[in-house]
């Protein structure tokens, strides 16, 4: 039996995606609020830095594991303000999360030029060489087969297309590392219980962060998927990192 991690638990590979879907379906309506509370608002600064990695907004952009649409809607607003002709596709395997993204897009009057697709990051329903940019923020660690998702990213990007990933990473500074670990395992699940009534969902999220590869390990995985010019930039002492790479 092919097993993988669901948090710290070992589960059958074929069951992980369903378990992850349940986590996000259960927290979808409070997802944005929880992001603010868990990160003390820092996730907004991280995402602002993330979208700065896309200099050309006259592009076809695929946002995978789009969730409630934060990245795509930031890009859509930036493009509208600059009168750029952007094409944005939001893809997520969880329909409940995409419903939140659609609602936000309508509320912000940003629905134009947006497409929504329910799809797995491991099996994207797009032809080869379709997009100029592939973005994924805080999503790739939830994919059952990360290597397969990276190869799919490489496939759907045009030649010299850019892969950009924002993900929780490994803190190296001792005092920050100790505080961060205590906060993650003790405070975040308690906030989840208080706000969402679901401590277990946030225990999983914390555990998935703990098990995610280090910056250098993930860099090698990206390179092995077929990318070139692979690099990363740490933010907030390595709490998160922005990984980037290009297709040949």
Curated annotation (Swiss-Prot):
Keyword Methyltransferase recorded: yes
A single Gene Ontology biological process assigned to it is: aerobic respiration
According to the lineage, what is the superkingdom? Bacteria
Q: Which PROSITE patterns does UniProt cross-reference here? A: SAM_MT_UBIE, UBIE_1, UBIE_2
NCBIfam families per record: MenG_MenH_UbiE, PRK00216.1-3, PRK00216.1-5
EC main group: transferase
Tell me the protein's name.
Ubiquinone/menaquinone biosynthesis C-methyltransferase UbiE
What's in the keyword line of the UniProt record? Menaquinone biosynthesis, Methyltransferase, S-adenosyl-L-methionine, Transferase, Ubiquinone biosynthesis
Its job: Methyltransferase required for the conversion of demethylmenaquinol (DMKH2) to menaquinol (MKH2) and the conversion of 2-polyprenyl-6-methoxy-1,4-benzoquinol (DDMQH2) to 2-polyprenyl-3-methyl-6-methoxy-1,4-benzoquinol (DMQH2).
Pathway listed for it is:
Quinol/quinone metabolism; menaquinone biosynthesis; menaquinol from 1,4-dihydroxy-2-naphthoate: step 2/2; Cofactor biosynthesis; ubiquinone biosynthesis
Q: Which reactions does this protein catalyse?
A: a 2-demethylmenaquinol + S-adenosyl-L-methionine = a menaquinol + S-adenosyl-L-homocysteine + H(+); a 2-methoxy-6-(all-trans-polyprenyl)benzene-1,4-diol + S-adenosyl-L-methionine = a 5-methoxy-2-methyl-3-(all-trans-polyprenyl)benzene-1,4-diol + S-adenosyl-L-homocysteine + H(+)
Q: What is its EC number?
A: 2.1.1.163, 2.1.1.201
Record family assignment: Belongs to the class I-like SAM-binding methyltransferase superfamily. MenG/UbiE family.
Query: Which CDD domains does the protein's record reference?
Result: AdoMet_MTases
Instruction: List positions binding S-adenosyl-L-methionine.
Output: 68, 92
Q: Which GO terms describe its molecular function?
A: 2-methoxy-6-polyprenyl-1,4-benzoquinol methyltransferase activity; demethylmenaquinone methyltransferase activity
| PANTHER family in UniProt | 2-METHOXY-6-POLYPRENYL-1,4-BENZOQUINOL METHYLASE, MITOCHONDRIAL (PTHR43591:SF24), METHYLTRANSFERASE (PTHR43591)
Q: Which Pfam families match?
A: Ubie_methyltran
